[in-house]
Structure formats: C-alpha cells, structure tokens
Amino acid sequence: PPLGVEGVAAADPNQWVPASDRPPFDWAGESVRRMGTVIHRWLRIICEDGLEKWPSHRVDAFTERISRHLKSAGISQDQLAEGVAQVKSALYQTLEDPTGRWILSGHTAGACEYGLSGSADGRIIHVVIDRTFIDDNGVRWIIDYKSSAHRGGSVEDFLDREKERYQEQMAGYARIMRGMENRPIRLMLYYPQLKNYREWGADEVSGLSYKV
C-alpha cells in the first residue's frame, strides 16, 4: 500500500437465453445495488487470485457459487436465474475487455476494496475504493466500478452524465489520497456490463493539483 495509507479488510460484500415464463427482473433500486455488490466481490476475487488464472470461460465453473452469493445478498428466488446471468455477463465482459484486464492485472501498490479515512467539512469520513494502484508512469489510479443500467440513447451521453453525477464523490476519494501521498492521480468509472469507462485527471478538480 502507499506510504501512510492503511488498508482495511472489506466486508463480504454470455450466454443468456431468457425463458418466456421468467418474471421480469427488477433492475431498480435494491436489486441493482445487490447485484452490483456481487459483481464487485467477484472482481476482487479475480484480481486477488491473479488475472492469469482467469480466462473468461472459467466464470462458468462458478455458477453455483455466484448463485449463493446473490441469495446471500438478498436476491429473491424468482430473480435468481436472471441475476446469475447478469453477474456472469459482467465478469465475461470485463475479462474480454483490454481495459478491464488492465484494471485487474498486477500493479505497484495495487489493492481492491481499499479502506481509507479522512476529514471533510470537519467530519471524519471513511471510504472504500474499489480498485487502486500506481501505474508504470507513477500515476495513482482510483477506480470505481459501476453497475448502472443504460436504457436506450447514446452510451457516450450516458457515460458523460455518469461522470457528472459521480465527479464530486471521486474528487473526495482523491482528496483523501492526496493527503497521504504526492503524485498525479487519475480517476475512473468502469462499467463492466458496457465494457466502457470514463477517466479524468484529479488535477482537473480545483484544489487537487500535486506538487512537482
């Protein structure tokens, strides 16, 4: 881990043929959050196992385990088959995506679900960063996985809106990290289901420049 930053243990957080008699899956609210928790968990498992052990077809061997994780997360029985298909699809997509593989590969000071504490507006806050590491150019990356659904319209417009939505949250992560180390920081929102992302430099946000 980077100097002065202490990681904390995180809590346990594409082949789909829909059956005509299967109830529609509720992607709103809690269902999305619960599915996202399981996707995060499996991305951490893959990363910590080592990417070289995870060709995309290996995901099929863990169907039952993914199902158990979804049940534990609160996905109901009638939504389970669809939930399993969506989690597996997200993992397939990530493992087939060059950016996804780069995120999950080994890096300097790499960590998953990395806990940090800092202060904001006079309050102590605690955050968990989905994935962070230092790349070959000495840049610290702070990456947040997102399971947001994209329904119609331009994917690029959707990603631009998502960046605007989460920019302040990501800036908060960068502020805490900046208090621990002085190096360039880049921020990324990564969308496994879309094989797509948005990234930007933390120095684009006022007050987050680093000292050369």
Where are these regions (language model features)?
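A short local loop/turn or secondary-structure capping micro-motif enriched for an aromatic residue
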Residues: 121, 150-153, 207-208
